[in-house]
């Protein structure tokens, strides 16, 4: 008895010594693959290129994780053709690369936007204030800005909500993540995160600015609710978007479409400029609709590409039963090699390419804003 409890004590001491202050995290690294690791091991995995959902907060029954628990994503009949060409073209015309440059310069001037750092909180504060300024003339019964507090870390997610006029319960979401990371030493080294993923955030900010200027201010209002999400902590295992979509699923919200923008600015070969539309772990019917938008409104083509499991925040939508899609700067193999380092800087990006991504966002929210899900 005595020996046994000594033995237990010894083991506890060993574990405590090995992982001081490090509670285990539960990671889902594949559809049927779950592992438990200390916090510091998450970084090692990322450095080796492994992507995952950190589901620690959202699973109580592990390690007996059951895939059947994941809801299936319903298929909706998205519009087979576009019907708002004039309005969309009118907005696209006004895309301002100068404004995008200014926002990205400011956003990348934070030493890092690592979600656990004070800098990461400050960058969220700047983003929230800038969004409030962009949308300040829209009355509160139409537009609200929510600071989604994650409790475990300081950098909050931001949800901009344009409430629909006739079917506000049907929700269309545009997402991007605001955090950046230096995978070498995240708490110490710089991570300007221009492409990854400041570019997605700035692409969506510009779309929000034009949506405000050319649409809402002219008295238009979408039938469905349109939301812009700026997620915290993507780099920690999609933590921010998992919190948001898990809450939406619990509240039984009806998300009819989600489009993620993440890495929108790098062009490896200007002679062969295109966007990459991600076909794995996304929702086929929605992906087809996004292709229609690209064909209708962009001056460059798309190419199908694959990005792997838990690639970006759209994965948090689909694993909660909501349709998700993802358009990235190019075919995956041609994407920016400088991400997650001090070299992910603004001078390596193309604002014209980011503007093409902004067109996708405007096309999607204006077309789906007036679409009837039934
Ligand atoms: C708010 O936006 C206007 C342009 O619409 C700009 O001139 C002004 O500097 C902005 N203010 C802040 C605090 O960002
Ligand atoms: C969309 O809203 C407008 C008014 O804002 C209304 O006239 C129209 O019937 C609505 N469309 C649908 C499909 O509900």
UniProtKB/Swiss-Prot annotation:
SUPFAM superfamilies attached to this UniProt entry: Zn-dependent exopeptidases
EC number annotated for this UniProt entry: 3.4.11.-
GO biological process, one term: proteolysis
UniProt: Zn(2+) 1 binding residues: 177, 196, 262
Cofactor binding note from Swiss-Prot or TrEMBL: Binds 2 Zn(2+) ions per subunit.
Coiled-coil regions listed in the entry: none
Pfam family, one: Peptidase_M28
GO terms under cellular component: fungal-type vacuole
Molecular function terms from GO: aminopeptidase activity; metal ion binding; metalloexopeptidase activity
Signal sequence residues: 1-18
Annotated residues for binding of Zn(2+) 2: 196, 235, 340
Classification via InterPro entries: M28_fam, Peptidase_M28
Record keywords: Aminopeptidase, Hydrolase, Metal-binding, Protease, Signal, Zinc
Cofactor names: Zn(2+)
Official protein name in the record: Probable aminopeptidase YDR415C
Protein species of origin: Saccharomyces cerevisiae (strain ATCC 204508 / S288c)
Taxonomic placement: Eukaryota, Fungi, Dikarya, Ascomycota, Saccharomycotina
